Protein backbone atom coordinates (compact mmCIF):
# COMPACT_ATOMS: atom_id res chain seq x y z
CA UNK A 1 0.00 0.00 0.00
CA UNK A 2 2.41 2.72 -1.21
CA UNK A 3 1.99 6.27 -0.04
CA UNK A 4 0.80 8.62 -2.76
CA UNK A 5 2.40 12.03 -3.20
CA UNK A 6 0.29 14.68 -4.89
CA UNK A 7 2.13 16.98 -7.28
CA UNK A 8 0.43 20.01 -5.75
CA UNK A 9 1.64 19.08 -2.26
CA UNK A 10 5.31 18.40 -2.95
CA UNK A 11 6.11 21.65 -1.18
CA UNK A 12 4.51 20.11 1.93
CA UNK A 13 6.35 16.77 2.12
CA UNK A 14 4.55 15.76 5.32
CA UNK A 15 1.37 15.36 3.27
CA UNK A 16 2.77 12.28 1.52
CA UNK A 17 2.00 10.09 4.53
CA UNK A 18 -1.65 11.16 4.45
CA UNK A 19 -2.54 9.38 1.20
CA UNK A 20 -2.18 5.76 0.08
CA UNK A 21 -3.26 3.59 -2.84
CA UNK A 22 -4.49 0.13 -1.87
CA UNK A 23 -2.46 -2.53 -3.66
CA UNK A 24 -3.36 -6.06 -4.68
CA UNK A 25 -3.56 -8.46 -1.77
CA UNK A 26 -2.44 -5.86 0.74
CA UNK A 27 -3.75 -5.83 4.28
CA UNK A 28 -4.38 -2.98 6.66
CA UNK A 29 -1.06 -3.77 8.34
CA UNK A 30 0.88 -2.70 5.24
CA UNK A 31 0.10 1.01 5.48
CA UNK A 32 -2.58 3.45 6.48
CA UNK A 33 -2.77 7.18 5.91
CA UNK A 34 -1.84 9.15 8.97
CA UNK A 35 -5.00 10.58 10.43
CA UNK A 36 -6.62 12.74 13.11
CA UNK A 37 -3.55 14.94 13.44
CA UNK A 38 -3.29 18.70 13.47
CA UNK A 39 -3.59 20.11 9.96
CA UNK A 40 -0.17 20.83 8.48
CA UNK A 41 0.49 24.58 8.06
CA UNK A 42 0.20 25.54 4.42
CA UNK A 43 -2.41 22.90 3.65
CA UNK A 44 -5.75 24.65 3.26
CA UNK A 45 -7.93 22.15 5.09
CA UNK A 46 -11.68 21.73 4.66
CA UNK A 47 -12.08 20.62 8.27
CA UNK A 48 -14.42 22.17 10.77
CA UNK A 49 -13.27 23.16 14.25
CA UNK A 50 -14.14 21.62 17.61
CA UNK A 51 -16.78 24.30 18.24
CA UNK A 52 -18.39 23.36 14.93
CA UNK A 53 -18.36 19.68 15.87
CA UNK A 54 -20.13 20.40 19.14
CA UNK A 55 -22.70 22.97 18.05
CA UNK A 56 -23.28 22.32 14.38
CA UNK A 57 -23.13 18.53 14.32
CA UNK A 58 -24.51 17.45 17.69
CA UNK A 59 -26.02 20.33 19.64
CA UNK A 60 -28.21 22.16 17.16
CA UNK A 61 -30.35 19.17 16.06
CA UNK A 62 -32.02 19.27 19.52
CA UNK A 63 -35.40 20.67 18.59
CA UNK A 64 -36.77 22.51 21.64
CA UNK A 65 -33.70 24.50 22.62
CA UNK A 66 -32.39 28.04 22.22
CA UNK A 67 -28.82 27.67 20.94
CA UNK A 68 -26.56 30.58 21.82
CA UNK A 69 -22.88 30.97 20.92
CA UNK A 70 -20.74 33.13 23.16
CA UNK A 71 -18.32 34.74 20.76
CA UNK A 72 -18.03 36.69 17.50
CA UNK A 73 -21.03 36.51 15.21
CA UNK A 74 -19.04 34.76 12.47
CA UNK A 75 -18.81 31.55 14.51
CA UNK A 76 -22.58 31.46 14.85
CA UNK A 77 -23.24 32.26 11.21
CA UNK A 78 -20.87 29.54 10.02
CA UNK A 79 -22.89 26.89 11.90
CA UNK A 80 -26.40 28.11 11.07
CA UNK A 81 -28.74 26.39 8.59
CA UNK A 82 -26.02 24.50 6.72
CA UNK A 83 -27.47 21.07 7.54
CA UNK A 84 -31.07 20.01 7.04
CA UNK A 85 -31.68 18.48 10.46
CA UNK A 86 -35.43 18.91 10.43
CA UNK A 87 -37.76 18.48 13.40
CA UNK A 88 -41.43 17.89 14.08
CA UNK A 89 -41.85 21.25 15.86
CA UNK A 90 -41.73 23.33 12.68
CA UNK A 91 -37.92 23.27 12.58
CA UNK A 92 -37.52 25.76 15.43
CA UNK A 93 -33.82 25.01 15.91
CA UNK A 94 -33.12 25.62 12.22
CA UNK A 95 -34.88 28.97 12.03
CA UNK A 96 -33.29 30.67 15.01
CA UNK A 97 -29.82 30.91 16.46
CA UNK A 98 -28.27 33.38 18.86
CA UNK A 99 -24.85 35.00 19.19
CA UNK A 100 -23.55 37.31 21.87
CA UNK A 101 -21.71 39.14 19.06
CA UNK A 102 -18.51 39.71 21.01
CA UNK A 103 -16.53 42.77 19.87
CA UNK A 104 -13.01 44.03 20.56
CA UNK A 105 -14.09 45.93 23.69
CA UNK A 106 -15.48 42.73 25.19
CA UNK A 107 -12.18 40.96 24.58
CA UNK A 108 -10.44 43.72 26.54
CA UNK A 109 -12.93 44.14 29.39
CA UNK A 110 -14.69 40.75 29.48
CA UNK A 111 -18.03 39.60 28.10
CA UNK A 112 -19.76 37.82 31.00
CA UNK A 113 -22.30 40.64 31.52
CA UNK A 114 -23.00 40.58 27.79
CA UNK A 115 -23.65 36.84 27.93
CA UNK A 116 -26.10 37.12 30.83
CA UNK A 117 -27.95 39.93 29.10
CA UNK A 118 -28.24 37.86 25.92
CA UNK A 119 -29.48 34.77 27.76
CA UNK A 120 -32.30 36.70 29.42
CA UNK A 121 -33.21 38.46 26.16
CA UNK A 122 -33.37 35.14 24.32
CA UNK A 123 -35.73 33.57 26.84
CA UNK A 124 -37.95 36.66 26.69
CA UNK A 125 -38.00 36.51 22.90
CA UNK A 126 -39.20 32.89 22.98
CA UNK A 127 -41.23 32.53 26.19
CA UNK A 128 -42.46 29.07 25.15
CA UNK A 129 -38.89 27.72 25.13
CA UNK A 130 -37.43 26.94 28.56
CA UNK A 131 -34.22 25.17 27.57
CA UNK A 132 -30.91 26.56 26.32
CA UNK A 133 -27.47 25.41 25.26
CA UNK A 134 -24.50 27.80 25.47
CA UNK A 135 -21.42 27.16 23.35
CA UNK A 136 -17.99 28.55 24.15
CA UNK A 137 -15.85 29.86 21.26
CA UNK A 138 -12.13 30.51 20.94
CA UNK A 139 -12.32 34.22 21.69
CA UNK A 140 -14.24 33.95 24.96
CA UNK A 141 -12.35 30.85 26.07
CA UNK A 142 -9.05 32.68 25.69
CA UNK A 143 -10.17 35.61 27.86
CA UNK A 144 -11.48 33.21 30.51
CA UNK A 145 -15.20 34.01 30.58
CA UNK A 146 -16.88 31.69 33.10
CA UNK A 147 -20.00 30.68 31.19
CA UNK A 148 -20.82 27.96 33.74
CA UNK A 149 -21.15 30.56 36.50
CA UNK A 150 -23.34 32.79 34.34
CA UNK A 151 -25.62 29.86 33.49
CA UNK A 152 -25.98 29.02 37.20
CA UNK A 153 -26.84 32.66 37.99
CA UNK A 154 -29.60 32.73 35.39
CA UNK A 155 -31.07 29.39 36.51
CA UNK A 156 -31.23 30.71 40.09
CA UNK A 157 -33.02 33.85 38.94
CA UNK A 158 -35.27 31.98 36.47
CA UNK A 159 -36.00 28.57 38.08
CA UNK A 160 -38.31 27.49 35.26
CA UNK A 161 -35.43 27.33 32.76
CA UNK A 162 -32.60 24.84 32.36
CA UNK A 163 -29.26 25.59 30.68
CA UNK A 164 -26.59 23.26 29.32
CA UNK A 165 -23.04 24.58 28.92
CA UNK A 166 -20.68 23.22 26.28
CA UNK A 167 -17.06 24.28 26.67
CA UNK A 168 -15.75 23.32 23.25
CA UNK A 169 -13.84 26.23 21.70
CA UNK A 170 -12.50 25.76 18.20
CA UNK A 171 -8.98 24.94 19.33
CA UNK A 172 -10.13 22.04 21.56
CA UNK A 173 -9.11 19.36 19.05
CA UNK A 174 -7.55 18.76 15.62
CA UNK A 175 -10.97 18.86 13.95
CA UNK A 176 -14.69 18.86 14.66
CA UNK A 177 -14.29 15.38 16.12
CA UNK A 178 -12.79 16.97 19.21
CA UNK A 179 -16.06 18.82 19.69
CA UNK A 180 -18.06 15.62 19.35
CA UNK A 181 -16.18 14.21 22.33
CA UNK A 182 -16.52 17.38 24.39
CA UNK A 183 -20.30 17.66 24.05
CA UNK A 184 -20.84 13.91 24.60
CA UNK A 185 -19.05 13.96 27.93
CA UNK A 186 -20.45 17.34 28.99
CA UNK A 187 -24.02 16.16 28.43
CA UNK A 188 -23.72 13.00 30.51
CA UNK A 189 -21.86 14.88 33.25
CA UNK A 190 -24.35 17.74 33.47
CA UNK A 191 -27.75 16.46 32.41
CA UNK A 192 -28.23 12.69 32.20
CA UNK A 193 -30.14 11.43 35.24
CA UNK A 194 -31.81 14.75 36.06
CA UNK A 195 -35.25 13.76 34.69
CA UNK A 196 -37.27 10.59 35.33
CA UNK A 197 -39.24 9.52 32.25
CA UNK A 198 -42.50 7.62 31.82
CA UNK A 199 -41.74 4.09 30.63
CA UNK A 200 -44.59 2.83 28.45
CA UNK A 201 -43.18 -0.40 27.00
CA UNK A 202 -41.07 -3.47 27.70
CA UNK A 203 -38.42 -2.53 25.13
CA UNK A 204 -36.83 0.89 25.64
CA UNK A 205 -33.92 2.35 23.68
CA UNK A 206 -31.85 5.47 23.25
CA UNK A 207 -31.24 6.10 19.56
CA UNK A 208 -27.75 7.60 19.57
CA UNK A 209 -25.67 9.29 16.87
CA UNK A 210 -28.61 10.16 14.63
CA UNK A 211 -29.20 13.76 13.52
CA UNK A 212 -32.40 13.55 11.45
CA UNK A 213 -30.93 14.82 8.21
CA UNK A 214 -34.04 15.40 6.08
CA UNK A 215 -35.97 12.93 8.22
CA UNK A 216 -33.55 10.01 8.71
CA UNK A 217 -34.40 9.75 12.40
CA UNK A 218 -38.13 9.68 11.78
CA UNK A 219 -37.76 6.86 9.26
CA UNK A 220 -35.78 4.72 11.70
CA UNK A 221 -38.05 5.52 14.65
CA UNK A 222 -40.97 4.37 12.50
CA UNK A 223 -39.37 0.91 12.24
CA UNK A 224 -38.70 0.83 15.98
CA UNK A 225 -42.28 1.75 16.83
CA UNK A 226 -43.61 -0.89 14.45
CA UNK A 227 -41.55 -3.38 16.45
CA UNK A 228 -43.13 -2.17 19.69
CA UNK A 229 -40.01 -0.37 20.91
CA UNK A 230 -40.20 2.82 22.96
CA UNK A 231 -37.63 5.38 21.81
CA UNK A 232 -36.83 7.19 25.03
CA UNK A 233 -34.51 9.74 23.41
CA UNK A 234 -32.61 10.49 20.25
CA UNK A 235 -29.11 11.89 20.58
CA UNK A 236 -29.75 14.37 19.09
CA UNK A 237 -31.73 14.72 15.82
CA UNK A 238 -35.36 15.65 16.47
CA UNK A 239 -34.58 14.91 20.10
CA UNK A 240 -35.97 16.83 23.04
CA UNK A 241 -33.79 18.34 25.75
CA UNK A 242 -35.67 16.70 28.63
CA UNK A 243 -35.86 13.38 26.80
CA UNK A 244 -32.09 13.36 26.61
CA UNK A 245 -31.86 14.05 30.34
CA UNK A 246 -33.60 10.69 30.86
CA UNK A 247 -31.15 8.56 28.86
CA UNK A 248 -30.20 6.58 31.97
CA UNK A 249 -33.49 4.66 31.95
CA UNK A 250 -33.12 2.95 28.55
CA UNK A 251 -32.56 -0.79 28.22
CA UNK A 252 -30.32 -0.48 25.16
CA UNK A 253 -28.28 2.19 23.37
CA UNK A 254 -28.71 1.79 19.62
CA UNK A 255 -25.72 3.58 18.04
CA UNK A 256 -25.74 4.82 14.45
CA UNK A 257 -22.78 7.21 14.02
CA UNK A 258 -19.96 5.79 16.12
CA UNK A 259 -17.57 8.59 15.19
CA UNK A 260 -19.65 11.34 16.75
CA UNK A 261 -21.48 9.61 19.59
CA UNK A 262 -19.74 6.45 20.78
CA UNK A 263 -18.37 8.39 23.75
CA UNK A 264 -21.74 8.89 25.46
CA UNK A 265 -22.70 5.27 24.71
CA UNK A 266 -19.56 4.03 26.38
CA UNK A 267 -20.16 6.25 29.41
CA UNK A 268 -23.79 5.11 29.71
CA UNK A 269 -22.53 1.54 29.75
CA UNK A 270 -19.96 2.26 32.47
CA UNK A 271 -22.16 4.45 34.68
CA UNK A 272 -25.60 2.88 34.19
CA UNK A 273 -24.91 -0.57 32.74
CA UNK A 274 -26.77 0.11 29.49
CA UNK A 275 -25.39 -2.07 26.66
CA UNK A 276 -24.42 -0.64 23.27
CA UNK A 277 -25.53 -2.06 19.92
CA UNK A 278 -24.05 -0.59 16.72
CA UNK A 279 -26.40 -0.49 13.73
CA UNK A 280 -26.44 0.81 10.16
CA UNK A 281 -29.52 2.38 8.58
CA UNK A 282 -28.03 2.64 5.07
CA UNK A 283 -28.60 -0.15 2.56
CA UNK A 284 -31.01 -3.06 2.44
CA UNK A 285 -28.75 -5.72 3.95
CA UNK A 286 -27.10 -3.58 6.66
CA UNK A 287 -30.49 -2.22 7.73
CA UNK A 288 -32.11 -5.66 7.73
CA UNK A 289 -29.22 -7.05 9.78
CA UNK A 290 -29.57 -4.13 12.21
CA UNK A 291 -33.30 -4.65 12.75
CA UNK A 292 -32.69 -8.36 13.28
CA UNK A 293 -30.01 -7.64 15.91
CA UNK A 294 -32.35 -5.34 17.82
CA UNK A 295 -35.12 -7.91 17.53
CA UNK A 296 -32.82 -10.63 18.87
CA UNK A 297 -31.79 -8.46 21.83
CA UNK A 298 -35.40 -8.01 22.91
CA UNK A 299 -36.66 -11.42 21.77
CA UNK A 300 -38.96 -9.99 19.08
CA UNK A 301 -37.24 -11.28 15.93
CA UNK A 302 -40.61 -12.06 14.34
CA UNK A 303 -41.58 -8.38 14.38
CA UNK A 304 -38.30 -7.39 12.73
CA UNK A 305 -38.71 -10.08 10.07
CA UNK A 306 -42.22 -8.93 9.21
CA UNK A 307 -41.01 -5.37 8.61
CA UNK A 308 -38.01 -6.50 6.56
CA UNK A 309 -40.10 -8.79 4.35
CA UNK A 310 -42.69 -6.08 3.71
CA UNK A 311 -40.18 -3.33 2.95
CA UNK A 312 -37.90 -5.42 0.73
CA UNK A 313 -40.83 -6.69 -1.33
CA UNK A 314 -42.01 -3.11 -1.81
CA UNK A 315 -38.73 -1.40 -2.65
CA UNK A 316 -36.23 -3.96 -4.01
CA UNK A 317 -37.54 -3.86 -7.64
CA UNK A 318 -36.96 -0.10 -7.65
CA UNK A 319 -33.44 -0.37 -6.25
CA UNK A 320 -32.58 -2.96 -8.89
CA UNK A 321 -33.85 -0.66 -11.66
CA UNK A 322 -31.17 1.86 -10.66
CA UNK A 323 -28.51 -0.77 -10.06
CA UNK A 324 -28.75 -1.92 -13.69
CA UNK A 325 -28.10 1.63 -14.85
CA UNK A 326 -25.38 2.52 -12.33
CA UNK A 327 -23.33 -0.66 -12.80
CA UNK A 328 -19.62 0.11 -13.09
CA UNK A 329 -19.90 3.86 -12.57
CA UNK A 330 -16.93 5.22 -10.62
CA UNK A 331 -17.51 7.12 -7.40
CA UNK A 332 -15.26 9.07 -5.04
CA UNK A 333 -16.64 8.50 -1.56
CA UNK A 334 -15.64 11.66 0.26
CA UNK A 335 -18.18 12.18 3.07
CA UNK A 336 -15.70 12.92 5.86
CA UNK A 337 -16.61 10.59 8.73
CA UNK A 338 -18.42 7.32 9.41
CA UNK A 339 -20.35 7.29 6.13
CA UNK A 340 -16.99 6.33 4.65
CA UNK A 341 -17.37 2.79 5.97
CA UNK A 342 -21.16 2.73 6.19
CA UNK A 343 -21.35 3.20 2.41
CA UNK A 344 -18.08 1.83 0.96
CA UNK A 345 -19.17 -1.77 0.46
CA UNK A 346 -22.93 -1.45 0.22
CA UNK A 347 -23.04 1.00 -2.69
CA UNK A 348 -20.93 -1.48 -4.64
CA UNK A 349 -23.00 -4.51 -3.67
CA UNK A 350 -26.46 -2.97 -3.92
CA UNK A 351 -26.03 -0.23 -6.54
CA UNK A 352 -23.21 -1.58 -8.69
CA UNK A 353 -21.01 1.49 -8.21
CA UNK A 354 -17.21 1.16 -8.04
CA UNK A 355 -15.50 3.09 -5.24
CA UNK A 356 -12.21 4.52 -6.54
CA UNK A 357 -11.37 6.82 -3.63
CA UNK A 358 -12.24 7.40 0.01
CA UNK A 359 -11.26 10.22 2.31
CA UNK A 360 -11.79 11.49 5.83
CA UNK A 361 -11.69 15.04 7.12
CA UNK A 362 -12.35 14.50 10.81
CA UNK A 363 -12.37 10.71 11.11
CA UNK A 364 -9.92 8.64 13.12
CA UNK A 365 -7.67 5.75 12.14
CA UNK A 366 -10.43 3.29 12.92
CA UNK A 367 -12.71 4.90 10.35
CA UNK A 368 -10.03 4.68 7.68
CA UNK A 369 -9.25 1.07 8.58
CA UNK A 370 -12.86 0.02 8.11
CA UNK A 371 -13.25 2.10 4.97
CA UNK A 372 -10.14 0.77 3.22
CA UNK A 373 -10.98 -2.80 4.25
CA UNK A 374 -14.29 -2.51 2.41
CA UNK A 375 -12.76 -1.09 -0.79
CA UNK A 376 -11.07 -2.86 -3.68
CA UNK A 377 -7.62 -2.78 -5.24
CA UNK A 378 -6.44 0.59 -6.51
CA UNK A 379 -8.58 2.69 -4.18
CA UNK A 380 -6.99 6.02 -3.26
CA UNK A 381 -7.42 6.81 0.46
CA UNK A 382 -6.73 10.36 1.67
CA UNK A 383 -6.76 11.98 5.10
CA UNK A 384 -7.67 15.67 5.45
CA UNK A 385 -7.19 16.61 1.78
CA UNK A 386 -6.98 20.19 0.65
CA UNK A 387 -8.77 21.61 -2.38
CA UNK A 388 -5.85 21.21 -4.77
CA UNK A 389 -5.37 17.57 -3.79
CA UNK A 390 -9.04 16.97 -4.39
CA UNK A 391 -8.83 18.46 -7.87
CA UNK A 392 -5.72 16.44 -8.67
CA UNK A 393 -7.45 13.26 -7.49
CA UNK A 394 -10.44 13.99 -9.72
CA UNK A 395 -8.15 14.48 -12.71
CA UNK A 396 -6.34 11.22 -11.97
CA UNK A 397 -9.37 9.03 -11.18
CA UNK A 398 -11.98 10.55 -13.52
CA UNK A 399 -14.98 9.53 -11.40
CA UNK A 400 -18.54 9.71 -12.67
CA UNK A 401 -19.72 11.26 -9.39
CA UNK A 402 -18.47 12.20 -5.94
CA UNK A 403 -20.43 11.85 -2.72
CA UNK A 404 -19.25 14.64 -0.46
CA UNK A 405 -20.15 17.91 1.25
CA UNK A 406 -20.98 21.27 -0.27
CA UNK A 407 -17.50 22.77 -0.21
CA UNK A 408 -15.63 20.10 -2.21
CA UNK A 409 -18.80 19.35 -4.16
CA UNK A 410 -19.12 22.84 -5.57
CA UNK A 411 -15.45 22.72 -6.56
CA UNK A 412 -16.05 19.43 -8.37
CA UNK A 413 -18.91 20.92 -10.34
CA UNK A 414 -16.52 23.52 -11.75
CA UNK A 415 -14.51 20.72 -13.35
CA UNK A 416 -17.71 19.07 -14.62
CA UNK A 417 -17.91 16.25 -12.10
CA UNK A 418 -21.40 15.88 -10.60
CA UNK A 419 -21.70 15.52 -6.85
CA UNK A 420 -24.32 14.46 -4.36
CA UNK A 421 -24.44 16.08 -0.94
CA UNK A 422 -23.48 13.33 1.49
CA UNK A 423 -23.83 15.61 4.53
CA UNK A 424 -27.15 17.43 4.14
CA UNK A 425 -28.48 15.36 1.20
CA UNK A 426 -30.21 16.56 -1.94
CA UNK A 427 -33.61 14.86 -1.70
CA UNK A 428 -33.47 12.70 1.41
CA UNK A 429 -34.08 10.98 3.70
CA UNK A 430 -31.57 8.35 2.59
CA UNK A 431 -31.92 5.95 5.54
CA UNK A 432 -34.43 3.14 5.48
CA UNK A 433 -35.44 0.89 2.61
CA UNK A 434 -37.29 3.61 0.71
CA UNK A 435 -34.55 6.11 1.56
CA UNK A 436 -31.89 3.90 0.00
CA UNK A 437 -33.89 3.89 -3.24
CA UNK A 438 -34.13 7.69 -3.06
CA UNK A 439 -30.35 7.76 -2.70
CA UNK A 440 -29.91 5.56 -5.78
CA UNK A 441 -32.35 7.76 -7.66
CA UNK A 442 -30.43 10.92 -6.78
CA UNK A 443 -27.12 9.33 -7.82
CA UNK A 444 -28.71 8.28 -11.11
CA UNK A 445 -30.19 11.74 -11.68
CA UNK A 446 -26.82 13.38 -11.03
CA UNK A 447 -24.75 11.09 -13.26
CA UNK A 448 -27.16 11.12 -16.18
CA UNK A 449 -28.23 14.76 -15.98
CA UNK A 450 -28.23 16.04 -19.58
CA UNK A 451 -26.62 19.26 -18.41
CA UNK A 452 -23.37 17.38 -17.79
CA UNK A 453 -23.37 16.23 -21.39
CA UNK A 454 -23.52 19.85 -22.47
CA UNK A 455 -21.11 21.32 -19.92
CA UNK A 456 -18.02 20.28 -21.86
CA UNK A 457 -19.09 21.95 -25.08
CA UNK A 458 -17.44 25.20 -26.10
CA UNK A 459 -20.40 27.11 -27.51
CA UNK A 460 -18.08 29.80 -28.88
CA UNK A 461 -16.91 27.29 -31.48
CA UNK A 462 -20.43 26.48 -32.63
CA UNK A 463 -20.04 22.74 -32.17
CA UNK A 464 -23.26 21.94 -30.33
CA UNK A 465 -24.27 18.31 -30.86
CA UNK A 466 -27.01 17.45 -33.29
CA UNK A 467 -29.54 15.51 -31.24
CA UNK A 468 -32.38 15.39 -33.71
CA UNK A 469 -35.67 16.97 -32.84
CA UNK A 470 -35.47 16.88 -29.06
CA UNK A 471 -33.37 17.17 -25.96
CA UNK A 472 -31.87 13.98 -24.53
CA UNK A 473 -33.46 12.65 -21.36
CA UNK A 474 -31.70 10.81 -18.54
CA UNK A 475 -33.18 7.51 -19.61
CA UNK A 476 -32.02 8.01 -23.18
CA UNK A 477 -28.50 8.43 -21.80
CA UNK A 478 -28.66 5.54 -19.32
CA UNK A 479 -30.42 2.86 -21.35
CA UNK A 480 -28.37 2.85 -24.53
CA UNK A 481 -26.18 -0.14 -23.63
CA UNK A 482 -28.73 -2.14 -21.64
CA UNK A 483 -30.09 -5.44 -22.88
CA UNK A 484 -33.65 -5.53 -24.15
CA UNK A 485 -34.60 -7.77 -21.23
CA UNK A 486 -33.51 -5.17 -18.71
CA UNK A 487 -34.74 -2.17 -20.67
CA UNK A 488 -38.22 -3.66 -21.12
CA UNK A 489 -38.48 -5.43 -17.75
CA UNK A 490 -41.95 -5.42 -16.24
CA UNK A 491 -40.67 -6.18 -12.73
CA UNK A 492 -38.07 -3.41 -12.39
CA UNK A 493 -39.34 0.12 -11.97
CA UNK A 494 -38.18 3.63 -11.08
CA UNK A 495 -38.81 5.19 -7.68
CA UNK A 496 -42.54 5.55 -7.05
CA UNK A 497 -42.50 7.23 -3.64
CA UNK A 498 -43.58 10.80 -3.07
CA UNK A 499 -41.52 13.94 -2.70
CA UNK A 500 -42.20 14.06 1.06
CA UNK A 501 -41.85 10.65 2.66
CA UNK A 502 -41.64 11.96 6.24
CA UNK A 503 -44.84 13.90 6.98
CA UNK A 504 -47.00 10.80 6.63
CA UNK A 505 -44.94 9.06 9.33
CA UNK A 506 -45.88 11.76 11.85
CA UNK A 507 -49.56 10.83 11.46
CA UNK A 508 -49.09 7.07 11.57
CA UNK A 509 -50.76 4.88 14.19
CA UNK A 510 -48.79 1.99 15.65
CA UNK A 511 -49.83 -1.41 16.99
CA UNK A 512 -50.30 -1.77 20.73
CA UNK A 513 -48.33 -4.78 21.91
CA UNK A 514 -49.34 -6.41 25.17
CA UNK A 515 -46.88 -5.71 27.98
CA UNK A 516 -45.31 -8.47 30.02
CA UNK A 517 -46.64 -8.93 33.53
CA UNK A 518 -44.10 -8.20 36.26
Curated annotation (Swiss-Prot):
Entry's EC annotation: 1.18.6.1
Reactions listed under catalytic activity: N2 + 8 reduced [2Fe-2S]-[ferredoxin] + 16 ATP + 16 H2O = H2 + 8 oxidized [2Fe-2S]-[ferredoxin] + 2 NH4(+) + 16 ADP + 16 phosphate + 6 H(+)
Residues binding [8Fe-9S-C-homocitryl] cluster, per UniProt: 257, 423
Example GO biological process: nitrogen fixation
SUPFAM superfamilies from the UniProt entry: Helical backbone' metal receptor
Subunit description: Hexamer of two alpha, two beta, and two delta chains.
Record function comment: This iron-iron protein is part of the nitrogenase complex that catalyzes the key enzymatic reactions in nitrogen fixation. Other nitrogenase complexes utilize a molybdenum-iron protein or a vanadium-iron protein.
The protein's name: Nitrogenase iron-iron protein alpha chain
Organism: Azotobacter vinelandii
Organism lineage string: Bacteria, Pseudomonadati, Pseudomonadota, Gammaproteobacteria, Pseudomonadales
Amino acid sequence: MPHHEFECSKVIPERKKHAVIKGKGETLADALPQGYLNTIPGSISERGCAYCGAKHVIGTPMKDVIHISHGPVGCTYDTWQTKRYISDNDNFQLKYTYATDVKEKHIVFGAEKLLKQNIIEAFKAFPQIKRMTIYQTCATALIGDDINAIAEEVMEEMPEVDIFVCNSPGFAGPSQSGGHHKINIAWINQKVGTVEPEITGDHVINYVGEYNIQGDQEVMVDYFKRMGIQVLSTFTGNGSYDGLRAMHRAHLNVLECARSAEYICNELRVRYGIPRLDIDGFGFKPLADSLRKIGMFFGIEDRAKAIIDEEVARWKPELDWYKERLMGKKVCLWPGGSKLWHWAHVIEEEMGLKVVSVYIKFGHQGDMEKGIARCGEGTLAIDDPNELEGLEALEMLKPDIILTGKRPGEVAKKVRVPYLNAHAYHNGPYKGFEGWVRFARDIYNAIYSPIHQLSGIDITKDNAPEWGNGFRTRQMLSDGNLSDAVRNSETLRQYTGGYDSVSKLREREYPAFERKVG
